[in-house]
């Protein structure tokens, strides 16, 4: 290790948490709901995958789903990243993405192509 980060590595002793960590960064004002944590992890990957389709990096839903499971470790129970969006329901996914964006930042804003697809209720 480089000797930098969250832990102190004293010579010949056990590592321990850097004492200034809590004072420098503190705790969040309010706890983040577990559902938000789970969905933030899934939604940010799903939104980026839609952008990859928009930009031609991915060309088929099948490639996106298989690649997301085997390539980036997206949970297999979802059927893949685009199947996750389909299962969530496109209009509901867009609505929830907007809620996450309002609470946690613009990286959760749904791309225009996803909004248009949701308006027509056309699955991937």
Question: Language-model segments: which ranges?
Answer:
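N-terminal glycine-rich phosphate-binding loop for ADP-containing cofactors
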Residues: 1-124
């Amino acid at each position: 290790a480089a000797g930098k980060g969250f832990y102190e590595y004293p010579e010949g002793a056990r590592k321990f948490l850097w004492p200034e960590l809590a004072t420098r960064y503190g705790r969040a004002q309010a706890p983040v709901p577990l559902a938000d944590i789970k969905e933030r992890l899934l939604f940010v990957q799903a939104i980026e995958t839609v952008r990859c389709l928009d930009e031609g990096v991915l060309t088929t839903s099948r490639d996106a789903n298989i690649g997301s499971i085997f390539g980036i470790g997206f949970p297999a129970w979802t059927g893949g990243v685009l199947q996750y969006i389909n299962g969530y329901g496109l209009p509901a996914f867009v609505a929830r993405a907007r809620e996450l964006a309002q609470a946690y930042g613009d990286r959760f804003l749904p791309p225009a192509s996803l909004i248009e697809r949701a308006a027509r209720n056309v699955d991937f």
